[in-house]
Each structure stands twice: as C-alpha cells, then as structure tokens.
Amino acid sequence: MKWITLICLLISSSFIESRILFKRDTDADHHKHIADVYTALTERTFKGLTLAIVSQNLQKCSLEELSKLVNEINDFAKSCINDKTPECEKPVGTLFFDKLCADPAVGVNYEWSKECCAKQDPERAQCFKAHRDHEHTSIKPEPEETCKLLKEHPDDLLSAFIHEEARNHPDLYPPAVLALTKQYHKLAEHCCEEEDKEKCFSEKMKQLMKQSHSIEDKQHHFCWILDNFPEKVLKALNLARVSHRYPKAEFKLAHNFTEEVTHFIKDCCHDDMFECMTERLELTEHTCQHKDELSSKLEKCCNIPLLERTYCIVTLENDDVPAELSQPITEFTEDPHVCEKYAENNEVFLGRYLHAVSRKHQELSEQFLLQSAKEYESLLNKCCKTDNPPECYKDGADRFMNEAKERFAYLKQNCDILHEHGEYLFENELLIRYTKKMPQVSDETLIGIAHQMADIGEHCCAVPENQRMPCAEGDLTILIGKMCERQKKTFINNHVAHCCTDSYSGMRSCFTALGPDEDYVPPPVTDDTFHFDDKICTANDKEKQHIKQKFLVKLIKVSPKLEKNHIDECSAEFLKMVQKCCTADEHQPCFDTEKPVLIEHCQKLHP
C-alpha cells in the first residue's frame, strides 16, 4: 500500500464539501451515510483515517494485515455512491464494525471480539473501545534504519508511523494522527541531515510525543467532563474558550460555534469517529467562512491546505482584544433591570455574562471564568429576592476583580518558589502537600503527580504573565481530572471525592484548599516500612532524588502531622546517613544500623 501519496494528497487538499453547517436534525438517530462521508473526505483521506481507526481497534494486527481491511472498507464506501443498498443507509460507525466483525481474522486474533460482535450498537462500539490496550509497547526503529527507509521507501516509513502512532494512542483523534505524521516526516528529513542523528531523533521525537500526549489528554478530558458533569459544563467551557480565542465575535456567533464544538466533541467521545471527523472538518471550513467576524489571525490558517488548516486553527493564539472592550463591563452590575433579564432566560443571560468577561479578560483561566459565572449566578439568585436588587449586586464587579487578584497572587507565590528553589525542591514541596492531602495514594503515584505538577509550573511560569493563569490552571485541571478518574475506580478519601464531584470550575481551587486528611490513621512503623540499601551509593543524581522522594512520602505517611521544619530536619538527617554509609567500608551493615536511629529521631518530632 503506497501511503506516501495519501499523505501528500491529504496535505495538498483544498476545501471539503460543506455539509449543512449549524443545522442539526432533531431525530436522535440521524447519522451521515457512508457515501456522504466518503465524498466529503475524498478517497485518500478516507483510507488514511480508516487505517488510523482500524489500527486503534485492532492493535495486534500488522500494517500488512490491516491493508486488506482498509481497502475492503474503502471499496464498499465507493460502491455506495451509486448503489444505494439498504446496507449503505446504515450509520457509518455501524458499517465500520460490521466489516470488522465479518473479518474471520478478527475473531481468531481477538477472542474478546466475539462477545463484542454479538452486541448491537452503540454497545458494540463501546465494547471494542473497552478492549483497547493503553499499555501497548511502541516499536522504535534505529535512526540509521529510519533514514534508510526515508530515502529508499518513504511510503513505508510514513505508513508505519500512522500505524504505530494510532495503535499506541488508541483514543487519539485520527486526523491528529495524520497531522503528527506530517510533522514526523519533516522531523525525519531534518534529523537525517544531522551529524548526530541519534541525538536529533531523541530530542525531536520527545517533543513530538509530548505534543501527541497533550492532544490526547485534552481530548480525554472533554470526555471525562461529559461523563461526570452536566453537558452545560462542557458548553460553558467551550463558550469561554471560543470567547477567549475570538474576542471580537459577538455573542450569537460565539454561541453558535460553542454548540457546534460541543456537538462534535460528543460524537468523538461516543466513539462515532467518522461523524466526529466530518464535523471537525466542517467546523474548520465554517470557521474560515466567518474569519473576518472571528479573528484577524485566521487569514494565515485559512489560506493553507486542509489538514494543516485544521491544526493551525486549533493551535491559533488568541486574537487581540478590540479597543472598545477596554471599558469596564457595567451591564451585569449597574443595570437596574438585571433581574428581569435574568428571569426571562437565565441560561442565555449567564451565557452573555460568561462571553463578556471571557472576551475581555484573556489573562484569566477558563476555569476561573466558569467559577466566576457560577458565583454570579448565586449572587443573582440571592439579590433578585431582595427589596433592592441593584444595591445587592452592585459590588459584583469588585468581587470578581478581588478574586482574580487572589488567584494571581497564589500563582505568583508558586512561581517565586519555583524560581528561588528550582524544579526539584519545588517538586518536593508539592509532594509534601499532596501526600498530606491524600496519604492513601501509592508512593509512586504521588511522586508522579508531584513531578507532573512541577513540569506544569516549569512550563507555565516561563510564559508571559498574561498567559500564566490560563496555562497553569488549564493544565492542572486536566491533571486533576486524571486523578479524579483514578479516585472513581479506587476510592482515596471523602475530601478528594468531594473536590472531584462538587464543581468542575472549582476543582483546582478545591484541591489547593485541601488540608491534611484528618481522618487518616497512619500505619505502624515496621522493619519493612523503610528500606535503605547500598544501591543509593552507586545511583545517579536522578535516581538519588527519586530515593529521597520515596523516603519523604513514607515519612509523611507514618508521621502525617510533621511540620515543614521537622520534615526538612529529617531530610537532612537522611542525607547525612547516606553520606556516612556510602563512605563506610561496608555500606549495607551501616544502613542497617543507622536506619532505626533515623526513624526514631523523626518519630520523636511527630506531635
């Protein structure tokens, strides 16, 4: 299968056929037919995306094995353009899984598929999704082999990347797989010209995979919101995001785009991938049709090929805030008729509020803006019952700005700690905080969370000040969402459960405000609680830091009420012990002797 042609044509495609933008069939069973999707996407795009999707669902199959299935699905789709059989009228997702289930090799290679194929949609699609392996091991060719393939058989190299990227990221939006493939092609061309190819590939692939994980995390986060909160939460988040990105868009247009974005996200999360992809491409075209009303920065995106255009729009920086928005917003706190407007249609009125503050305040995070809208709603619910509502809600704007100042101050405090002490000590500070908040979590998970939080701090504290809060709170909320997903499967404690379920917009601030878990009962210290051996003496710096962090976590779990100065004292004593024992003639006997002395010293500090 010669996929290099596919990739090149994907990149050079122009506009796709537009499909009834913003018109939604009220029938819940409405779906596009496969001939419509095939025509809209073109054959080459259809085959490329089909390869990505089958690779995500049949992860053990080789590229050669999947080629036959891809061609079979493609031939059937092509036949449906002129031959409208009853089967062609089925939803695209249904047809896709019909083809998978009809393939004898699928039943042989995937025993579980028999159970899935016996189900009806949407349960069948959900069953396949549930069996995706998220721990699949990637096959990474050596740089020399990669460069040889690039020179002699570039089609094989790129098709292999689509296959590998898709099965290693089974929930990644398939067009994103193709966009990443294009970047990989450029990366390979660049690194194959470098003298130190191995270093170049290592550094560039790390960046590309980080981008891949980021796209997948954001996509997964949207689905997590839909699964755990009312749909209006996702709509509000999208409205804040659209208003941030396109501040000159009026409310009606911003609201329409919000509805469209929310609809295609729902299709993606329900695993209706063909519907999802078609709608994403439609939204791209619709965005370009309205570029003058949306953003002065869209021109550069709308003049490039389709695949690049979609990625360009998704990653586009916010447009400049129009000069007329520099004036204070008065219509929500100074208008004497606020309560009448709120009573007339509270959802639309609150949407207008969220749109107004989001387009004006790009320096504020979407999560803060959602929380502000929720607090404004509470304010109106209270004030509109009083004898003098305007007097009651007139301080709403001051309250909003004071809360924003507090949030900025907290962010600055953490960035100052990071800059003063460095990432590793900042990571340890976070590790202490979160071990006290949720001591029930495993040592390695806590260390991983602290490391990811420190990475977010390192990245977001380095961006311009007016971008820090959106960066930090956006990324932290995604990380906390993952934590909450684990909490749902493996209960941590009541305080964490409350933060995960009470309010999406307040989730990050809820976790920040959490104190030590007062209900936690520390386990008794045994000989197995702490383990020190001479491996630390030969460990590299990174490994030594990890060993120290494991000691920190264990220490807090058995002595959760230790104050910061006592934790620092114990850490210093730990380092003294390591220094002493690693210079002793016999390392292990020294550790065995010094361990109980260290533990007893630290336990005496515990109140």
UniProtKB/Swiss-Prot annotation:
CDD domains noted in UniProt: ALBUMIN
GO terms, molecular function: lipid binding; metal ion binding
Signal peptide: 1-18
UniProt-listed Pfam families: Serum_albumin
Entry keyword set: Cleavage on pair of basic residues, Copper, Disulfide bond, Lipid-binding, Metal-binding, Repeat, Secreted, Signal
Annotated ranges, domain Albumin: 22-209, 210-402, 403-600
Binding positions for Cu cation per the UniProt entry: 30
Cysteines engaged in disulfide bonds, as pairs: 80-88, 101-117, 116-127, 147-192, 191-200, 223-269, 268-276, 288-302, 301-312, 339-384, 383-392, 415-461, 460-471, 484-500, 499-510, 537-582, 581-590
Propeptide: 19-24
Function: Serum albumin, the main protein of plasma, has a good binding capacity for water, Ca(2+), Na(+), K(+), fatty acids, hormones, bilirubin and drugs. Its main function is the regulation of the colloidal osmotic pressure of blood.
Protein name: Albumin B
Organism in which the protein naturally occurs: Xenopus laevis (African clawed frog)
